[in-house]
């Protein structure tokens, strides 16, 4: 038995945070003993393992590792035995149990949690962006967006912006109203980043009438007037032609379907919709 300061080497194909957390939690169970932890992240090959174990052997360190690639795990175990080093495989046993329980094969993809974290934060950023630059609140968002949605009121610009945000796409949207000139920023972005949205006037009339009813207002307001709607749609189409952007008629389409068409345009560069 010895009270010498134990040394734990953390070896990981990612950041090594999982193994470090477990190691510190275990070390905390021993009061009065300080544990030295050396973390080596992004280990991808056998040569790197050789170098680490050679150093670890000088301190008779404990090896705690999270390596998802089975070949590297097996190699590390064999080399550690050669150096008479004790090892703890933090991920391997649980991966095997899950595979046995589900009958599925694991992907053995290193650093996958980091990839998922990046996707999550990209989505959060996109949602915050969509809220900040909704309904033309700040035209500067037009220049920062991955896609800019334009159209008259009630053509689903906001719900589409939020749907795209959940896909990690930063979407700004600009309402087109005959009495209000669109921001100059709209004409400064590449036309392929702008999507025009339109609806058949009959459907738009129904949607706006229902909106007024929900708000407790009469349907005789200009907002739901058929002639006014036709005027707005013609004005909007003129702006879209000036921008040179693709136009999607969302009549009869679910949000998911329209969003899918937007993504196709963005990624395939389609012009005619």
From Swiss-Prot:
Q: What is its EC number?
A: 2.7.11.32, 2.7.4.27
Q: Which UniProt keywords apply?
A: Kinase, Nucleotide-binding, Serine/threonine-protein kinase, Transferase
Binding sites annotated in the UniProt record for ADP? 151-158
**What catalytic activity does the UniProt entry give for this protein?**
N(tele)-phospho-L-histidyl/L-threonyl-[pyruvate, phosphate dikinase] + ADP = N(tele)-phospho-L-histidyl/O-phospho-L-threonyl-[pyruvate, phosphate dikinase] + AMP + H(+); N(tele)-phospho-L-histidyl/O-phospho-L-threonyl-[pyruvate, phosphate dikinase] + phosphate + H(+) = N(tele)-phospho-L-histidyl/L-threonyl-[pyruvate, phosphate dikinase] + diphosphate
Pfam families the UniProt entry points to = Kinase-PPPase (PF03618)
Give the enzyme's main class according to its UniProt record, as a single word: transferase
InterPro entries to which the protein is assigned, alphabetical: Kinase-pyrophosphorylase, PPDK_reg
Is Kinase found in the keyword set? Answer: yes
GO MF entries: ADP binding; ATP binding; phosphotransferase activity, phosphate group as acceptor; protein serine/threonine kinase activity
The similarity comment for this entry is: Belongs to the pyruvate, phosphate/water dikinase regulatory protein family. PDRP subfamily.
Cited function: Bifunctional serine/threonine kinase and phosphorylase involved in the regulation of the pyruvate, phosphate dikinase (PPDK) by catalyzing its phosphorylation/dephosphorylation.
Protein name listed in UniProt: Putative pyruvate, phosphate dikinase regulatory protein
- From which source organism is this entry? Desulfitobacterium hafniense (strain Y51)
């Amino acid at each position: 038995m010895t009270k010498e300061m134990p040394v734990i080497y953390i070896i990981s194909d990612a950041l090594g945070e999982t193994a470090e957390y477990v190691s510190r939690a275990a070390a905390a169970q021993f009061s009065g003993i300080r544990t030295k932890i050396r973390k080596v992240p992004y280990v991808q090959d056998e040569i790197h393992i050789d170098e680490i174990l050679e150093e670890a052997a000088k301190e008779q360190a404990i090896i705690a590792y999270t390596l998802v690639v089975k070949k590297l795990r097996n190699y590390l175990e064999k080399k550690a035995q050669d150096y008479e080093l004790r090892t703890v495989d933090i991920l391997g046993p649980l991966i095997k149990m899950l595979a046995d329980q589900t009958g599925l094969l694991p992907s053995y993809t290193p650093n996958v949690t980091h990839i998922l974290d990046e996707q999550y934060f990209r989505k959060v950023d996109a949602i915050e962006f969509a809220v900040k630059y909704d309904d033309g609140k700040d035209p500067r968002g037009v220049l920062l967006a991955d896609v800019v949605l334009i159209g008259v009121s009630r053509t689903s610009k906001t719900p589409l912006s939020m749907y795209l945000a959940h896909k990690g796409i930063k979407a700004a949207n600009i309402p087109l109203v005959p009495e209000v000139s669109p921001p100059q920023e709209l004409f400064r972005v590449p036309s392929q980043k702008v999507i025009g949205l339109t609806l058949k006037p009959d459907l738009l009339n129904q949607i706006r009438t229902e909106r007024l009813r929900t708000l407790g207002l009469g349907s005789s307001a200009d907002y739901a007037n058929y002639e006014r709607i036709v005027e707005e749609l013609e004005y909007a189409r003129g702006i879209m032609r000036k921008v040179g952007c693709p136009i999607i008629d969302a009549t009869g389409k679910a949000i998911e379907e329209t969003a899918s068409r937007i993504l196709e345009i963005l990624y395939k560069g389609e012009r005619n919709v």
